[in-house]
Amino acid sequence: MMGSAVRKFALTTHVTSSVGWLGAVAAFLALAIGGLTSTDVPLVRAAYLAMEFITWFVIVPFSVASLLTGLVQALGTPWGLFRHYWVMAKLAVTVVATAILLVHTQPIGAVADGALQGPLAAGDLRPLRLQLVADAVAALFALLAATTLSVYKPWGMTAYGQREAVAPVRAPMSIIWTRSMLLIALGVLILFVAWHLVSGGLHGH
């Protein structure tokens, strides 16, 4: 388990990245709505260009940081990764939200490219522009759900957690397994993000 100072640092990092992610998504949603509904051509163009930069330089880094620091928090504190239902549910929400975010960066780039090429009329790229609003709303609800789980911590302990509560001393193999899980998750995520940045980053589509 992590020491007190390390645990507080990890918690601070996790909360900061999670709050930053939520705030960036809220800003993204405001820009998406403005870009969809405004008739001011310069404003629409600026909104979609800003959305692409917010995505790659704020939302993506904060989402990855939130997921990784969440794993560190789970594996390095008594909460554990599989001991409480709320931890598992929050992890699932975060993983799904991060994966969907990375997959749906292509429409953002497509609309930003369209804005660069010239003024966007009301009907131009409308399906993609509507998708950006819908994606942002879904992401906002997912992050609010994750925040709610962190605050209320519902549903109690899993069967695995109850067994560990009775016999809290971990076997060496259990320690090796949890550390291996963390390293594998980190490696897979880093490789996926690196591949996506290379193949579908800013104007890479």
Residue ranges and their predicted role:
Residues M1-H205:
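Polytopic transmembrane helical bundles with strong interfacial aromatic enrichment
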